[in-house]
């Protein structure tokens, strides 16, 4: 199972009107399930609540955060994350905290709309939502092509057996 660390801006794209990456961000957030788990930092949850409260009010903001908890996971910003962020060369402290949290949480990659800054400092792969979706599509296409090339294989069960 792949562990995706979702940067704050990806979630905000789905609740703020007129954001340029809203569609791809929403598509990534719908992917959670058996094949991948999505994680936010506790710092992102606070930001998400704050922004949602300004847009939809206190009760609905709580519903937005509750919806995230229903399907996904939250990583704490620990003292280790803060220490790592302080030692980082990353000039943006918030980005450094997110990177440290993703690394400490043993995530496989970071999904952000700020790939330029994150890629320079993150010790793990960084993708924009569009890049991640394109990679998933390409992997699915290769799998379908492979399965269809097998003689008389009608399903994955035929291959596994």
Question: In which residue ranges do the predicted regions lie?
Answer:
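Active-site neighborhoods of divalent-metal-dependent phosphate/nucleic-acid chemistry enzymes
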Residues: 74-116, 159-161
């Amino acid at each position: 199972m792949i562990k995706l660390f979702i940067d704050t801006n990806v979630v905000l794209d789905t609740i703020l009107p007129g954001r340029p990456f809203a569609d791809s961000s929403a598509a990534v957030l719908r992917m959670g399930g058996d094949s991948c788990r999505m994680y936010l930092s506790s710092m992102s949850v606070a930001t998400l609540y704050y922004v949602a409260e300004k847009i939809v009010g206190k009760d609905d903001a709580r519903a937005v955060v509750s919806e995230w908890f229903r399907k996904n996971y939250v990583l704490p910003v620990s003292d280790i994350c803060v220490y790592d962020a302080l030692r980082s060369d990353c000039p943006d402290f918030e980005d450094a905290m997110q990177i440290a949290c993703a690394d400490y949480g043993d995530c496989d990659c970071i999904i952000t709309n700020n790939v330029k800054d994150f890629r320079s400092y993150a010790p793990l792969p960084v993708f924009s939502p569009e890049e991640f979706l394109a990679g998933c599509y390409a992997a699915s296409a290769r799998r379908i092509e492979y399965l269809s090339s097998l003689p008389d294989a009608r399903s994955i069960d035929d291959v596994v057996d």
